[in-house]
A protein has these predicted regions:
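Catalytic Walker B motif of ABC-type/P-loop ATPase nucleotide-binding domains
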Residues: 161-165
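Conserved ABC ATPase signature
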Residues: 136-140, 144
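Conserved catalytic motifs of ABC-family nucleotide-binding domains
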Residues: 157
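The feature captures the beta-strand-to-loop junction immediately N-terminal to the Walker
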Residues: 35-37
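Conserved ABC transporter NBD signature motif
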Residues: 58-66, 75
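Helix-to-loop junction immediately C-terminal to a conserved catalytic motif
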Residues: 50
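H-loop (His-switch) and adjacent beta-strand-loop-beta switch element
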Residues: 209-223
Length: 254
């Protein structure tokens, strides 16, 4: 089943398009990684998929329904987002932050019931941070906050999960745990779209890689072709030899 369809979409701001004529689709249980330099438009594309940034042209559909026709509650039940950072202005506990992921299923003036707490705690356990449940959000490290944001998104039980550089603040062990979690979500039928600066992460989990170029053009294909040193070198402004040297994975060798 096709989960996400993007048809001739141009995204950005009035008079300043960032990406033009983007078209691709993702099926249920697939993982797609967005690769591109800083400022290339990866986050802008995700904000448009979420309905936070109106399209300049084209359309985006989730399960064959245009996002423009979905209510905010229906959109929140269909798609969740893990942003790069969240500084939280209030003294919420980690569990309270994760429970916010259950908002699409709770009445406006209702309180989370026991089953909602079980769902939130289960996501904290999945990511190995159940011990942080009662911690104040303001006391967390950057990596701990990132894991809690992932738990909050998973608590939404979305069909489509968007992750914006989710490993950027994680130590090596938590990166491994994150990749294992993404594989498990894929096996359970969730569709994942992840922006990353780690080609090895894309190689480890992605079915499809989308290259976001500096000129606003987008190309996509399997990791075996999109993650070659020559392609990555052009994307990040370095040489193929530098790619091979720094990544050191057999896939990237000549």
């Amino acid at each position: 089943m096709t989960r996400l369809t993007i048809q001739h979409a141009s995204v950005g701001y009035p008079g300043r398009p960032v990406l033009r004529e983007v078209s691709f689709s993702l099926t249920s249980g697939s993982v797609c990684c967005l690769l591109g330099a800083n400022g290339s438009g990866k986050t802008t594309l995700m904000r448009s998929i979420l309905g936070l940034l109106p399209l300049l042209s084209g359309q985006i559909l989730i399960d064959s329904i245009a996002i423009a026709q979905m209510t905010p509650r229906d959109r929140a039940r269909a798609v969740a987002w893990v942003p790069q950072a969240h500084d939280g202005a209030f003294a919420f506990s980690v569990l309270e932050m994760v429970l916010m992921g259950r908002s699409p299923y709770i009445g406006t003036f209702s309180q989370p019931i026991k089953s909602e707490h079980h769902i939130a705690l289960a996501q904290l356990e999945t990511l190995g941070i159940a011990h942080l449940a009662t911690r104040n959000w303001a006391t967390l490290s950057g990596g701990e906050r990132q894991l809690a944001l992932i738990a909050r998104a998973l608590a939404q039980r979305p069909r489509l999960l968007l992750l914006d550089e989710p490993a950027s603040s994680l130590d090596f062990g938590h990166q491994i745990r994150l990749l294992d979690t993404l594989r498990e979500l894929r096996q359970n039928g969730m569709t994942l779209l992840m922006a990353t600066h780690h080609p090895l992460h894309a190689l480890a989990v992605a079915d499809t890689v989308i290259r976001v170029e500096a000129d606003g053009l987008v190309s996509h294909g399997p990791p075996s072709t999109r993650l070659q040193p020559d392609n990555l070198a052009g994307l990040y402004g370095v040489t193929p030899a530098q790619i091979r040297h720094h990544l050191g994975n057999p896939h990237f060798q000549e």
